[in-house]
């Protein structure tokens, strides 16, 4: 089954890197949507089916934690795996993300292998994709 993925980051360059990495994972990906902040991401999720989200934590307007809380509060999106992306030293925010139900996290700067390993772990855990 092909998956629809949403990449959320305020940096267009990071979004492009994540899209390239996702295409290299070997996952059957139908569509990669993108958004520049949490509010945009909610709009994308309202308009399109999304099976997995990779989101930065630190963003303007609506940050990744606020976005994650909104996703988890929605019966429609509650089961969608959300992987958080954070900078070094973001332990407090990572802890909050895990408490809110994040499927995992990756630290910036990340490698393609780290993203692949995290997604493989989500697949092995049986999270719906």
Residue ranges and their predicted role:
Residues 48-54:
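Active-site beta3 strand of CheY-like receiver
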Residues 56, 86:
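Active-site residues of response regulator receiver
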Residues 110-120:
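C-terminal output helix
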Residues 34-43, 64:
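Helix N-cap/capping motif at the beta->alpha junctions
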Residues 12-33:
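Two-component/phosphorelay signaling modules centered on CheY-like receiver
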